Amino acid sequence: MAATEPPSLREQAEMDDADNSEKSVNEENGEVSEDQSQNKHSRHKKKKHKHRSKHKKHKHSSEEDRDKKHKHKHKHKKHKRKEVIEASDKEGLSPAKRTKLDDLALLEDLEKQRALIKAELDNELMEGKVQSGMGLILQGYESGSEEEGEIHEKARNGNRSSTRSSSTRGKLEITDNKNSAKKRSKSRSKERTRHRSDKRKSKGAGEMLREKANRSKSKERRKSKSPSKRSKSQDQARKSKSPPLRRRSQEKVGKARSPAEEKMKSEEKGKIKDRKKSPIVNERSRDRSKKSKSPVDLRDKSKDRRSRSKERKSKRSEIDKEKKPIKSPSKDASSGKENRSPSRRPGRSPKRRSLSPKLRDKSRRSRSPLLNDRRSKQSKSPSRTLSPGRRAKSRSLERKRREPERRRLSSPRTRPRDDILGRCERSKDASPINRWSPTRRRSRSPIRRRSRSPLRRSRSPRRRSRSPRRRDRSRRSRSRLRRRSRSRGGHRRRSRSKVKEDKFKGSLSEGMKVEQESSSDDNLEDFDVEEEDEEALIEQRRIQRQAIVQKYKYLAEDSNISVPSEPSSPQSSTRSRSPSPDDILERVAADVKEYERENVDTFEASVKAKHNLMTVEQNNGSSQKKILAPDMFTESDDMFAAYFDSARLRAAGIGKDFKENPNLRDNWTDAEGYYRVNIGEVLDKRYNVYGYTGQGVFSNVVRARDNARANQEVAVKIIRNNELMQKTGLKELEFLKKLNDADPDDKFHCLRLFRHFYHKQHLCLVFEPLSMNLREVLKKYGKDVGLHIKAVRSYSQQLFLALKLLKRCNILHADIKPDNILVNESKTILKLCDFGSASHVADNDITPYLVSRFYRAPEIIIGKSYDYGIDMWSVGCTLYELYTGKILFPGKTNNHMLKLAMDLKGKMPNKMIRKGVFKDQHFDQNLNFMYIEVDKVTEREKVTVMSTINPTKDLLADLIGCQRLPEDQRKKVHQLKDLLDQILMLDPAKRISINQALQHAFIQEKI
């Protein structure tokens, strides 16, 4: 009995502490419950009942609270019984135990006194100084105690995270470990209480008298307090049920924990609160009696708390390290952070975000050496009692523990840009040795790994040399993070794209870029290291790529194999996928720039070279092919044609006599709502029209010179004047603005909109001038032959970049085809245009006629839900057409389109067919394909049921055709075939993603 007695007593004392401190916290936050306000007078007459009245915190307590109270009562009874037994057994106890029990009794007395003093102070705070919660906040600002708000918040956050992390750990730990941890923490708390009791004893009696005087004063004040004020405070209390507490109660409901765990957690909480409050009380009473709230003292308090919480953290992490050496604390911490809902993240005070804990400590220290001194006396920190070795260990652990937090705060995503600039200088001071210490490198959190700084890139080779198991684990966590980040809205993606640095880009704003680079993260120290490492990394990647290419080459020889090439090598593909998406984008952008520089005047020459590779028989084949696929684009959508002649202008009705049809609404609008263009007229008092480009479904386009911008050339798109077209035009305007805002540096190859205006009730959009579209380029240069593989590679890079931007902005273009892709004069740069059919990804109405037919994805035809994959399919069809000069799927109907797609890829998966709304139009009950064709003789429709469809179209043969290709080009064509195979998967879920496409060997490897 004697053996088990002291621990239970101690537990009891700690439970009391937890309860009291929790109540005092509530009171401090201004939570005055109704019962308390009613019982105020009675409480002051009979002081003994104070605790009991405090237990009745809320009238309508929840079930858990009742349970807790029930347990509490039982504990009290046990406690009394034990005291009786203890009295009888005291003679038999050893002197050491007796002193321990004396200490505990003394501690209880002191706690009661402390609670009384606290209550008085709180009452004084409630009425003399502050009328309402708002007042409290204002007063905090007046006294210059911004730190105090910060501290409260930090305490809250700290509590939250500690409980969370402890819960995750608690689940993993073994019970005997728990007991040992308990014993350790108890012994520490005992030491601390002993220190405190000594301190308190040494306090003079004069101070006690002063406190009594205060008490009497506050009593009088309280009596005179107006009822209205009291009711106000009650209301506030009701409203401001502090969120942390509520959250805690929810956690308790949500997770049914083992009683041992719960007890441990409650003890921990109690201890934390106790530690935070008790040493400050005396100091506060002194301050308040003088009625001077000095900001200095507040700062002191904040430091105290901070130092204590840090020590606590380090202790906890030490215990963890002993228990499970496998799991690094940084991982633990970071995972906790990831799980925290993003909505809670912004709720931190901006000041706290801006300073890392270490820097804050430094700046504080330099501000007040005097305070520092006082603090060292005040906080009898347990870390001082550790041996020097252990202290050092705890310090490094502490640093590790703080690292993920600091990283999260310092990552460019969470910081405003101007903060970064200001902070960079400070980060230079923060010892570089520490920054590169091995412990730190080891504890790199996954978040950091994703960050964009060049540091990460420079370290990656080192990371690769880890053991396979760890590499695997980190890769898994990375992919999880990537998935998570994808799901978080496009907004953050957009902001990220602005912060991104493009190292290679020789743009006008390069000076600006350099500044940004130097100010982002702390990558100033080791630039030489970075360069070396980067070269090593590039070399490694090149070797990997070659291996992949070799593998693909052998697969490509067997032309009937459709696409298992990608999944067949998960290892190599994951290895090649190691660079971050941003690196890939940068590399591709650099490639495009290089292509532009090198091929300013070589476009026509390269096309001629391709013509020369063709053999004579090719011509016969092409004429046959021509009959099969009539050119539906002969005179249709030539929106941005390069040339215009008087015949075409006359045909479009330009320069005709306006008097010809007086019945029209206006003379400047024709019967179909198109604007009648007059060469030489001035639009919006600044655009001088000098040429007519052509007309599309929605609009006609003119060329003009902008008088307000030194006669800069522009293209003006004049939308048709009818309700539907106006609506479409406004939608296009909205999407263009969104895309242009998301891509300020013009890296992503979507058409730039300069401005818009109204002219004679027509909406006019002003664009950058581009000479011609790819349909015209094909017609003019590559008719039935296609373009050079170099050009196709560069165009594919640019199209994938455009898709990337569309995805970032959650937009589907839904009409990608050569007609809607414009090129500049030198045919090196292309821009995606015509967003008239575009929609938000969430508004994807199921319609079988979305996208031009030849470029329509199979999921649209069968009426399945669709997303960004439809644009990827269209790009695949376009790339084939650019290289061969022929349309890939020249279907006459939707049914024919499905037949042609299945001729290339085999029968559509049943799982996919079942999801289609229009499946019955193309498949029977047994999901066999019903091919509808027109009989050549009778010209009637006949239906052929096809249970199996084998892939008969040979993509590689079509791509190479009759060309005699040199080896380097042949290799490139094989790669293009492989890329198209992955793009043209019938099931959109298996279709290649944009990032994967950008990393494909065809895109990455130069010719």
From Swiss-Prot:
Q: What is the lineage of its organism?
A: Eukaryota, Metazoa, Chordata, Craniata, Vertebrata
Q: Where is the composition biased (Basic and acidic residues)?
A: 83-92, 248-271, 294-303, 316-325, 395-408, 415-429
Domain of life here? Eukaryota
Instruction: Tell me what this protein is called.
Output: Serine/threonine-protein kinase PRP4 homolog
Q: Which reaction does it catalyse?
A: L-seryl-[protein] + ATP = O-phospho-L-seryl-[protein] + ADP + H(+); L-threonyl-[protein] + ATP = O-phospho-L-threonyl-[protein] + ADP + H(+)
Residues the entry annotates as binding ATP: T693, G694, Q695, G696, V697, F698, S699, N700, V701, K717
- Which stretches does UniProt call biased (Low complexity)? 158-169, 562-581
Q: What is its main location?
A: nucleus
Q: Where is this cross-link: Glycyl lysine isopeptide (Lys-Gly) (interchain with G-Cter in SUMO1)?
A: K118
One cellular component term (GO) for this entry is: nuclear speck
This chain's source organism reads: Mus musculus
Cross-link named Glycyl lysine isopeptide (Lys-Gly) (interchain with G-Cter in SUMO2), where?
K100, K112, K118, K171, K178, K593, K659
Entry keywords, A to Z:
Acetylation, ATP-binding, Centromere, Chromosome, Isopeptide bond, Kinase, Kinetochore, mRNA processing, mRNA splicing, Nucleotide-binding, Nucleus, Phosphoprotein, Serine/threonine-protein kinase, Spliceosome, Transferase, Ubl conjugation
Q: Cite the record's Basic residues compositional bias ranges.
A: 40-60, 68-82, 180-203, 215-231, 304-315, 342-367, 438-497
Question: According to its UniProt record, which residues of this chain constitute the active site?
Answer: D815 (proton acceptor)
Record EC number: 2.7.11.1
